[in-house]
UniProtKB/Swiss-Prot annotation:
<dbReference type="GO" id="GO:0006633">
    <property type="term" value="P:fatty acid biosynthetic process"/>
</dbReference>
<keyword id="KW-0863">Zinc-finger</keyword>
<feature type="binding site">
    <location>
        <position position="27"/>
    </location>
    <ligand>
        <name>Zn(2+)</name>
    </ligand>
</feature>
<dbReference type="InterPro" id="IPR041010">
    <property type="entry name" value="Znf-ACC"/>
</dbReference>
<dbReference type="GO" id="GO:0005524">
    <property type="term" value="F:ATP binding"/>
</dbReference>
<feature type="zinc finger region" description="C4-type">
    <location>
        <begin position="27"/>
        <end position="49"/>
    </location>
</feature>
<keyword id="KW-0276">Fatty acid metabolism</keyword>
<dbReference type="GO" id="GO:0009329">
    <property type="term" value="C:acetate CoA-transferase complex"/>
</dbReference>
<dbReference type="InterPro" id="IPR000438">
    <property type="entry name" value="Acetyl_CoA_COase_Trfase_b_su"/>
</dbReference>
<keyword id="KW-0443">Lipid metabolism</keyword>
<dbReference type="InterPro" id="IPR034733">
    <property type="entry name" value="AcCoA_carboxyl_beta"/>
</dbReference>
<comment type="function">
    <text>Component of the acetyl coenzyme A carboxylase (ACC) complex. Biotin carboxylase (BC) catalyzes the carboxylation of biotin on its carrier protein (BCCP) and then the CO(2) group is transferred by the transcarboxylase to acetyl-CoA to form malonyl-CoA.</text>
</comment>
<keyword id="KW-0808">Transferase</keyword>
<keyword id="KW-0067">ATP-binding</keyword>
<dbReference type="GO" id="GO:0016743">
    <property type="term" value="F:carboxyl- or carbamoyltransferase activity"/>
</dbReference>
<keyword id="KW-0547">Nucleotide-binding</keyword>
<keyword id="KW-0444">Lipid biosynthesis</keyword>
Length: 292
């Protein structure tokens, strides 16, 4: 090889090995690249911008409840395609696909357990299951959870994450709004606390029923909360909505919710509130310091 060929020859570049999948995550708000193990330790909250990423319903209960003495409620309930509904796809096929991808039987998970030693029932919507939509099984499982609360005289905590009622079940889905509201009315008559925790997003029939019937309403930061979406409202009223409209901070400022709590502080906050609401003796829960 001549001297000119040596100069013009392309240098050998060692190809970098591919990064294994599942090692890194990207914040959907600020674009920060986060080591997945660090993200899990921060409960899926971005360590740079504090953006609260969406989590599954089961993960939310695992984060919230104490590890021991947990009992799942309504595991035998299965959705049925009574109407034989079909849009671009058969409803029964949508159910099967959602069950396969999430590992859940429907969009609500309910468990009896404790948080910092305080007994309760906690339910959580899974937005990954058909948008967390409320259907017959969701309503039935929520009512079962309320009945367990009534039987054992313990409070109920609900984590909402839903697009609203499930259109494939039509009127039967809308009936769950009344059904769940009636169950909460029974709890209220018995003086049992219900804390509603609004996460991103809480919309439609869920926001118009059980999600806004709490004794206390807590939201995660910047959660989208409302009935119709902002784009639909703007198209209907033909006006530009205020900045931050339907976000948790906007609702807090206008008195629609009681407080906004970081996910990493949720266990402490709820345990302390429940201890006060039930006049429990001095426990670990009552000693937690919460910024109010």
């Amino acid at each position: 090889m001549s001297w000119i060929e040596r100069i013009l020859a392309k240098p050998k570049i060692n190809k970098r090995r591919g990064v294994p999948e599942g090692v890194w995550s990207k914040c959907t708000a600020c674009g920060n690249i986060i080591y997945k193990a660090d993200l899990e330790r921060s409960l899926n909250v971005c360590p740079k911008c504090d953006h609260h990423m969406r989590v599954t319903g089961r993960s939310r209960l695992d984060i919230f409840l104490d590890k021991d003495n947990r009992e799942e409620i309504g595991t035998d309930l299965e959705p049925k395609d009574v109407l034989r509904f079909k849009d671009s796809k058969k409803y029964k096929d949508r159910i099967a696909a959602a069950q396969k991808s999430t590992g859940e039987n429907d969009a609500l998970i309910a468990e009896k357990g404790t948080v910092k030693g305080v007994p309760l029932v906690a339910v959580a919507f899974d937005f990954n299951f058909m948008g967390g939509s409320m259907a017959s099984v969701v309503g039935a499982k929520f009512v079962l959870a309320a009945e367990v609360c009534l039987k054992h005289r313990i409070p109920l905590v609900c984590f909402s994450a839903s697009g609203g009622a499930r259109m494939q079940e039509a009127l039967m889905s809308l009936m769950q709004m009344a059904k769940t509201s009636a169950a909460l009315a029974r709890m209220s008559e018995e003086g049992l606390p219900f804390i509603s925790i609004l996460t991103d997003p809480t919309m439609g029939g869920v926001s118009a029923s059980l999600a806004m019937l709490g004794d206390i309403h807590i939201a995660e930061p910047k959660a989208l909360i409302g009935f119709a979406g902002p784009r639909v409202i703007e198209q209907t009223v033909r006006q530009t909505l205020p900045e931050g409209f339907q976000r948790a901070e906007f609702l807090l400022e206008h008195g629609a919710i009681d407080m906004i709590t970081d996910r990493r502080d949720m266990r402490d906050t709820v345990a302390r509130l429940l201890a006060k609401m039930q006049n429990l003796p001095s426990t670990e829960a009552t000693e937690v310091s919460v910024n109010e």
